[in-house]
Amino acid sequence: MKFKFGVDSFIWAEDFKEKDLWIIEKAKEIGFEVVDFAIANPYTFPTEQVKAELARVGMDCVCTTTLTLETNPISPDEEIRKAAVAAMKKCVDICNTLGSPILGGVNY
C-alpha cells in the first residue's frame, strides 16, 4: 500500500460548497495527493462538481462527516435517529460517487 499525503478541506471551508471547488486545485498545487472532504451537510454537498474537479486535477479523496443534534443516532427521539440514518446513507452515497474508500469523522 502506498502512503498518500492529504489535507482536510475544513481548513479552508467549514461547509464545503460549489464555491470552494478551488480548494482541490490549490491542494494539488501545494503538493497534496488527497483531499479529505469534511461533509458538513450531505444534502448540499456538490458531489458531481467535486467528482469532475477531482478528475480534472488528478486528485484522490476521502470523506469525513460529523453528526449533529439533529442527526444523532442515539437520540431518544425516533425521528432524529431516522434523520441520522438518512444522513449517513447520503454520506455513503457521496463516498461511492467520489471513490472515497472511507467515511470517517465524529459519527457517534
Where is each model-derived feature located?
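N-terminal pre-domain/capping segments
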Residues: M1-S100
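Active-site-proximal loop/short-helix segments
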Residues: V106-Y108
